[in-house]
Swiss-Prot record:
Function: The glycine cleavage system catalyzes the degradation of glycine. The P protein binds the alpha-amino group of glycine through its pyridoxal phosphate cofactor; CO(2) is released and the remaining methylamine moiety is then transferred to the lipoamide cofactor of the H protein.
Catalytic activity field: N(6)-[(R)-lipoyl]-L-lysyl-[glycine-cleavage complex H protein] + glycine + H(+) = N(6)-[(R)-S(8)-aminomethyldihydrolipoyl]-L-lysyl-[glycine-cleavage complex H protein] + CO2
Domain of life: Bacteria
Presence of the UniProt keyword Ribonucleoprotein in the record: no
Alphabetical list of Pfam families matching this protein: GDC-P (PF02347)
Organism: Staphylococcus haemolyticus (strain JCSC1435)
Entry protein name: Probable glycine dehydrogenase (decarboxylating) subunit 1
Classification of source organism: Bacteria, Bacillati, Bacillota, Bacilli, Bacillales
Amino acid sequence: MSHRYIPLTEKDKKEMLDKIGASSINELFGDVPKDILLNRDLNIASGEAETSLLRRLNTVANKNVTKETHASFLGAGVYDHYAPAVVDAMISRSEFYTAYTPYQPEISQGELQAIFEFQTLICELTDMDVANSSMYDGITSFAEACILAFNHTKKNKIVVSKGLHYQALQVLKTYVKVREEFEIVEVDLDGTITDLEKLEQAVDDETAAVAVQYPNFYGSVEDLEKIQSFIEGKKALFIVYANPLALGLLTPPGSFGADIVVGDTQPFGIPTQFGGPHCGYFATTKKLMRKVPGRLVGQTQDDEGNRGFVLTLQAREQHIRRDKATSNICSNQALNALASSIAMSALGKQGIYDIAVQNLEHANYAKNQFKDNGFEVLDGTSFNEFVVKFDQPIKDINKKLAKHGFIGGFDLGEASADFENHMLIAVTELRTKDEIDTFVKKAGELNGSK
């Protein structure tokens, strides 16, 4: 009988070796030099009973600091938001819980409709014409948007604000590293917001696109209308990396003339996780529809006039025209897109607005509390994040905060040397007044101690 966790019996091994004409495992690996072979058992503990193993693993897991054990003020792209209970219940259903790409529409109508609804919701939030079925994460969507701009305009310069997520800039640089002709011009900040004078100077007739974040990485809301005015007449694209929850309250980028709007739907129904997965969205205009990366689901009719859904405009994709594909992205995050769709649908337009308002109010309350307690809070119109200056390294402050039941904000020194000892603090609808008050008080005590 085979081991419970190792299904190969000695008989199985013999049959496999006989099939390939090898007499033993050693003969199978005979080409491997003997001096690099490990001639002993692995130095690991022997097996143990399932009950004791679970007990030991739970003991290890209980050492973790999580949002269930600590109040989280950490954001920087991943936020602790409320997810309606219906989200997990729906995405766990067997008809959705699959990574299969629905190439065969006749057997995939439910999945295709779910993706179509996601695309529709994204278009409504961003005020754009068309959205794809999702991408790996917001930063992937951003990098793909920049590549689209290069290819569409046939220009080689892109102007980006340093207010963009620093990892988005890193990924973009990785994307264009093999294309020496591409130039990335980074525009400095004025405090926590893009220096508009320097941005205007950087944009010229050779610019393929201008890219900003909304709200930006430092929590401040950029002036999209003003930025768009710098682009007019330059034949450059306007790319906006937007927090979709903030769009429940802020004027959507499409209303300011954005050509491409990208972002991450993690705030809607996707929990905070160590390393993901997330769900990027990519929305654009009809003019650029045929250059969109990733999958597109369209609505159609069958021979009998019934409404149906199919993957459409597939000639853009590498499984149809590999050498002329708009992108090498051939997958998506359909399950997470479904989670976000369910969350948005459960909340509704008013619910999204209400939660966005709560984020705004809670963050501004926390900002004022920090000011009242003697902290320097950097100026900027905030949504749910803001920057606070400390007298000590943020890494040390956060270690101490964890001992008092708090997950502190992001150490901005990791993003930029200009923000050493600055903390990016996120305050969502889940943070209570008592948690905020205690967090600010404890931060003040720790900041004053050596």
